[in-house]
Amino acid sequence: LRMFGNVPSSRPTAWNSYLKSIKHIEIEEATLTGSFASYFRGTDFPVLESVRIEQCNLSGVTSFEMAFYNSGIEKVIIRDNDYPKAPSLLTATQYMFSLCRNLSELDLSGLDTSAVTNMYAMFQNCTSLEELDLSNFDTSSATNMYAMFSGCRSLEKLDVSNFDTSSVAHMQFMFEKCSILEELDLSNFDTSSVTNMSYMFQLCPALKSLYLDNFTDAAIMTGMFAGTTSLTYLFV
């Protein structure tokens, strides 16, 4: 399925008869407006394998909440997009890729997250994802990162080194069950606003090196390192 021109957030009813047979969606040189919450979810697109959103105007998108929730999708490319009406209107990405258990290729370099406040469980249980580069993510407005990467059990490399976390209050379960991740650099994290870090690194048995240079204690830190049995280098 190829889409271009003006793409509204409400899907045409005429699509309903063939949604269940669509495997690939390409949106190119289009203008997207409104809320795309649950737009590509697995219950509506049961055989969807890939989505590409490229060279589009995304400045009118307000939400990607649960956009790919529980999808069998394998590849998502969102890159080289334009935001001519700055600032971005996108405020919600919670559960965006949650339960995308087959997702193995993800490029979000063209997603403007500068206004996003809620990243709750954004990548939760992306169990096939091995690498995730979020070095270009603007998280300056984010307040909630609860369980953001929880259950990413195949993740070997995660780059969150440029995250601005100065407004984040919730980090509980953020990296829980990232079971083969060996190194994590959070030296740039500002945790001065964080109230809850409970179980943040729980059940990360392969984690050996953890950089927490700028961390400050939160009010709640219960079980923060529970199950981090290989932790050898902790830099604080």
Please report, for each region that a protein language model flagged, where it lies by residue:
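Short, well-ordered alpha-helices that flank and scaffold nucleotide-derived cofactor binding pockets
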Residues: 41, 66-69
